[in-house]
Design a protein with these regions (language model features):
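Short amphipathic beta-strand/extended segments with alternating polar/hydrophobic composition
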Residues: 23-28, 89-93
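Non-transmembrane, membrane-adjacent beta-strand/coil modules in membrane-associated proteins
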Residues: 16-25, 31-84
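Conserved beta-hairpin
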Residues: 1-26
Length: 110
């Protein structure tokens, strides 16, 4: 049974699940964006897990390039976080959680 955890701890954005982990220092975040659904970008899995329930791990998108996904299929919104060397997409099964995360991260950048 796979779990995906997305949280902020000690000024670091963390996403973990299925044996994959991504951490970005909040000061290194260059862009935070909220999407109604996962962008259609022909993502190709380079090293990760994919079922009809989730997509986790390392992927490559046509527009976004190398990125990490911690995505439950069929859940929205989707949060994209970009630093100089990483792009990560996350969502949650918990209603309102990702919007809250988005607001927290954009507050840091005011």
């Amino acid at each position: 049974h796979v779990k995906i955890n997305v949280y902020i701890a000690d000024d670091t954005f963390m996403a973990a699940g299925g044996g994959y982990k991504c951490s970005i220092n909040i000061n290194d975040i260059q862009e935070v964006q909220l999407f109604n659904e996962m962008p259609k970008d022909n993502f190709t899995r380079t090293n990760g897990g994919s079922t009809n329930e989730y997509d986790i791990g390392n992927y490559k998108g046509r527009t976004y390039g190398k990125c990490m996904l911690f995505i439950w299929d069929g859940y929205s919104p989707v949060l994209m976080i970009k630093s100089s060397n990483k792009t990560v997409f996350v969502n949650s099964k918990e209603d309102g959680y990702i919007k809250q995360m988005y607001e927290k991260l954009t507050d840091y950048h005011k």
